[in-house]
Amino acid sequence: MGTIFHLDIVSAEESIYSGPAEFIVAPAVMGEVGIYPQHTPMLTRIKSGVVRVKAPLQDDEEIYVSGGMLEVQPDVVTILADTAVRGQDLDEAKALEAKRKAEEIMKNKTSDIEYARAQAELIEATAQLAAIRKLRKRRH
């Protein structure tokens, strides 16, 4: 039984992480899941939240994802995220501004499409803010 597996976290824009991991914790839709080497194969949706990565001989790395898919094979784990941002790169001011704009658009909606788009942006901004708070707590 191996002690590490290969992990890839990619978004539509870029590869965020590609390398060895001892374990990860990911925000699956059915709740947080912990993945260790030789885990049973699995394919599941993930929701917005933080993926915690424990790599050999390194500090934990935290990566915000806004949803996507998690595929687990015995020696390879892949996360295909809609959006993925390293925890330290999350911008609280930008997320607060996006939340404010989305709420304003929803309040003054001109079409159902505009309202739905603003609602999705509000959910994304709220999830980012929750991730920022969670990461801040973990560091203190």
From Swiss-Prot:
**Annotated GO CC locations:** plasma membrane; proton-transporting ATP synthase complex
**What cystine pairs are annotated?**
none
| One function term, GO molecular function aspect | ATP binding
Q: What topology does it adopt in the membrane? A: Peripheral membrane protein
Listed SUPFAM superfamilies:
Epsilon subunit of F1F0-ATP synthase C-terminal domain (SSF46604), Epsilon subunit of F1F0-ATP synthase N-terminal domain (SSF51344)
Its keywords, alphabetically, are: ATP synthesis, Cell inner membrane, Cell membrane, CF(1), Hydrogen ion transport, Ion transport, Membrane, Transport
Tell me the InterPro entries matching this sequence. ATP_F1_dsu/esu_C_sf, ATP_synth_F1_dsu/esu, ATP_synth_F1_dsu/esu_N, ATP_synth_F1_esu_C, ATPsynth_dsu/esu_N
Q: Where in the cell is it found?
A: Cell inner membrane
Quick one: where is this thing mainly located? Answer: membrane
Q: Which family does it belong to?
A: Belongs to the ATPase epsilon chain family.
Provide the assembly information.
F-type ATPases have 2 components, CF(1) - the catalytic core - and CF(0) - the membrane proton channel. CF(1) has five subunits: alpha(3), beta(3), gamma(1), delta(1), epsilon(1). CF(0) has three main subunits: a, b and c.
- Tell me, what does this protein do in biology? Produces ATP from ADP in the presence of a proton gradient across the membrane.
| Name this protein carries in UniProt | ATP synthase epsilon chain
